[in-house]
Amino acid sequence: MLGLTLEGGASRTVYSCGIMDALLEDKIIADYVIGVSAGAAFGVSYCSGQIGRNLRLATEFMGTKKYMGARHLIDPKNRCYYNLDYAYNVVPNVELPFDYEAYRNFKGRFCAVVTNVKNGKAEYMDVPKDDTHWNLLRATCALPLLFPEIEINGEKYMDGGISDSIPYLQAIKAGCDKNIVVLTRPKGYVKTQEPATKLAIKYYHKHPEFAEAIATRAERYNKCIAELMELKAEGKVFVFTPKTTFGVGRTEGDPVKLRKLYDYGYNHAKWAMDDLKKYLCK
């Protein structure tokens, strides 16, 4: 059983989009896909088999003022850096149609990670095949300070990366004996507390366990990477890691930079395809 784990990283995740399209071209379809934040948001087009859709999303939509920007964050009806209705409703349902029928026919399982605001713990949810407003994907992408809390079944959730940034262990628990893990940070990256971390901790002080998860994220991330790389060295997982992200940051919208990062991911996967197939056949 093949698992595919997709780290988040907002615009940096365009690297993963190139890899996913290369996998689709070579008919490498995972039985279990799990994504965090943008990893899940882009991963759904892998599950629907729509090669090139993520590239169009990145280069034609993400850089527009309609898609994201500070003005959306201060809009009391939106309260998010991204235009929520446009990104999760208008784009997939009108301007860049998502193939719901193909997704319904996907034989694998697709999960997203979210963090429960009440207790700071990770929850792993199947991405519905009939939610045309993508509420779960909004939740897994809900970065602290940049998104409102997203309600699902009466509970409030935010970005899955806070509690489980690289959920490959969940794929193993699901029964995957072969695992592809796609990272979006360069090899050797060590996470440190971001400048906004202290502000986020204060902002969410009414939810102390959630604030604690934010405070300890860097330490847990680095431990996870170290353990993952041990498994890679033992040949138990196949890991894609970019050597560079070409200066693409979290909210990058420059279509030239995004295309360059996508192409890099695509070419990386094609270059590694023989080794990947050997791993899958072991």
Please report, for each region that a protein language model flagged, where it lies by residue.
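Patatin-like phospholipase
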Residues: M1-V36, V44-K282
